[in-house]
């Protein structure tokens, strides 16, 4: 299993809690046994990570409540917000994160628009 500074961990995970690193590494290993090494296994590992962690800036933090972070993750279709927990945050919390990231026009944005802007800014 990768350790904190192992190069095979993505940079955002190297800056994240050990639990996030373990979740990603275990899921990746399982997905590679199922699908073989490659993009599909990595996407599966990140999908698993997003159920318990949320991407905040350049690292992952635990969510208050485990589960899907957006409608696409919950239903398998529709728009995704790149790891931003749409359901787990109020509009005000998303607004504060957008302010910290320097998102322009945030005062007139809806909750969905704020999540979309945060996801775009964090890429």
Language model regions located:
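Short, mixed-charge, low-aromatic patches
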Residues: 1-5, 70-75
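Alpha-helix boundary/capping detector
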Residues: 50, 67-71, 120
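Helix N-cap / loop-to-helix initiation motif
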Residues: 37-40, 110
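Amphipathic alpha-helical segments in structured regions that serve as interaction surfaces
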Residues: 1-35, 42-56, 63
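Intrinsically disordered, low-complexity charged/polar segments
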Residues: 56, 60-74
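Poly-acidic low-complexity segments
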Residues: 24, 40, 69, 83-86, ...
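Basic helix-extension-helix modules of the SAP/HeH family
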Residues: 75-123
């Amino acid at each position: 299993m990768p350790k904190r500074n192992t190069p095979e961990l993505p940079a955002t995970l190297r800056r994240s809690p050990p639990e996030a690193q373990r979740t990603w590494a275990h899921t990746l290993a399982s997905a590679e046994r199922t699908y073989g090494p490659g993009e599909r296994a990595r996407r599966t590992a990140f999908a698993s990570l997003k159920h318990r962690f949320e991407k905040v800036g350049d690292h992952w933090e635990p969510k208050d409540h485990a589960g899907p972070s957006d409608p696409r993750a919950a239903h398998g279709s529709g728009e995704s917000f790149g790891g931003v927990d749409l359901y787990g945050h109020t509009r005000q919390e998303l607004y504060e994160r957008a302010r910290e990231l320097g998102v322009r026009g945030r005062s007139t944005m809806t909750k969905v628009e704020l999540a979309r802007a945060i996801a775009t800014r964090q890429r």
